[in-house]
Structure formats: structure tokens, C-alpha cells
């Protein structure tokens, strides 16, 4: 019983960390990355479709993304979706492809992005702590039903706390890496 609760908590904490890493990978740094456009959806024959399903996104150079749209008639819609996103990008058609130059980040924008990333990190920490609370509540319920001893309860809480500390350490490490990446010129 307790081992199942611990395993469940560990899996959920790992999902929180991975979700955080995915979220911050979408934050624009000075370098071009195809994942930058992951959140963009394009209206394709009346339905909203992720850009990844309509085109291939490659890195042309450190400051330019190249989008090869599978259906040529969707080029203008893809450009419109990129401009409508809050990424501050200005795509341009280059023959059959769309080029998306990434303007250099200003110091002020870097600081804003750092604040955003810190906020995401705090949300991830809160999510990890919520998983810890849920696991501890389940163990307390077992203790209340006299299914486990107080020693098992204490031991389980200590192990869940160790898992929580490890997950938060991973979040902090990813945050430090992203902040360093954002502040590079």
C-alpha cells in the first residue's frame, strides 16, 4: 500500500518537473529553436491545427527558423498565426518557405523573460508540494484506519519529503540553466 503511494507520488513529481522543463523550453532565448513555435496553432480548413502537423520547422542559422509548409496554400495562414502569437516574431515568405528571423533580445526583455521563467518554476514547486501533500494525506488515512503503524507513517513521510526535495532540486537546476541561457549575449 505505502509503496504504491510512494511510486505514484514519484511518478507525479517527475511529471511536474518534465512539464516545467517543457514549458520553459518554449521561452525564447537569443538562439533559434524549432520548439519555439510548438505552441502555435493555425486555422486549417476550419479547425485549429498545431504548426508541427502542417509544416516542418528547421534552424537555418542561429537567428533564423525556416518553415517548410506541406500545403503551399497554407503559407499565408501560417504567417498570420506566427504574427498573432505573443512571441514578437515577423515571418517573411522566401519562395516556397517561410523565414522567421529572431530579433536579438533587449536587456529589458531578458529580465522580463527571467521573471516569467521564475514564475513557472514557482508553479512547478507548488505542484510538487501538492503531490507531497496528497501522498501524505493518503498515508494518514491508512494510519487512521489502522492499516499501518505510526513508524510506517513517519518513515513514509520522510521518504516522500526526500522525493520532494529531489524534484524541487531538479526544478531549480533547470531554472538556473534557463536563466543563464537567457542572460547570455
Swiss-Prot record:
Subcellular compartments: Cytoplasm
UniProt keyword terms in alphabetical order: Cytoplasm, Protein biosynthesis
Could you tell me the gene encoding this protein?
A: frr
Function, in words: Responsible for the release of ribosomes from messenger RNA at the termination of protein biosynthesis. May increase the efficiency of translation by recycling ribosomes from one round of translation to another.
Q: What is its main location?
A: cytoplasm
> What GO CC annotations are associated with the protein?
cytosol
* Cytoplasm recorded as keyword: yes
Alphabetized InterPro entries for the sequence: Ribosome_recyc_fac, Ribosome_recyc_fac_dom, RRF_sf
Q: What lineage does the source organism belong to?
A: Bacteria, Pseudomonadati, Pseudomonadota, Gammaproteobacteria, Enterobacterales
Instruction: Return the SUPFAM superfamilies for the record.
Output: Ribosome recycling factor, RRF
Stated name of the protein: Ribosome-recycling factor
Name the source's superkingdom.
Bacteria
Example GO molecular function: ribosomal large subunit binding
Q: Which family does it belong to?
A: Belongs to the RRF family.
User: Signal sequence span per UniProt?
Assistant: none
Amino acid at each position: 500500500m505505502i509503496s504504491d503511494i510512494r511510486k505514484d507520488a514519484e511518478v507525479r513529481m517527475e511529471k511536474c518537473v518534465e512539464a516545467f522543463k517543457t514549458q520553459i523550453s518554449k521561452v525564447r532565448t537569443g538562439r533559434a529553436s524549432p520548439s519555439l513555435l510548438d505552441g502555435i496553432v493555425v486555422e486549417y480548413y476550419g479547425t485549429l491545427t498545431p504548426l508541427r502537423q502542417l509544416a516542418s520547422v528547421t534552424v537555418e542559422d542561429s537567428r533564423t527558423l525556416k518553415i517548410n509548409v506541406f500545403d503551399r496554400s497554407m503559407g499565408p495562414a501560417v504567417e498570420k498565426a506566427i504574427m498573432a502569437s505573443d512571441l514578437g516574431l515577423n515571418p517573411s515568405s522566401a519562395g516556397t518557405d517561410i523565414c522567421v528571423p529572431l530579433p536579438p533580445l533587449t536587456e529589458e526583455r531578458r529580465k522580463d523573460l527571467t521573471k516569467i521563467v521564475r514564475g513557472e518554476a514557482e508553479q512547478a514547486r507548488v505542484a510538487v508540494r501538492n503531490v507531497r501533500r496528497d501522498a501524505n494525506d493518503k498515508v494518514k488515512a491508512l494510519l487512521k484506519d489502522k492499516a499501518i503503524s505510526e513508524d510506517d507513517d513517519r518513515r513514509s513521510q520522510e521518504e516522500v519529503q526526500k522525493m520532494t526535495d529531489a524534484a524541487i532540486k531538479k526544478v531549480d537546476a533547470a531554472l538556473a540553466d534557463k536563466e543563464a541561457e537567457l542572460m547570455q549575449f
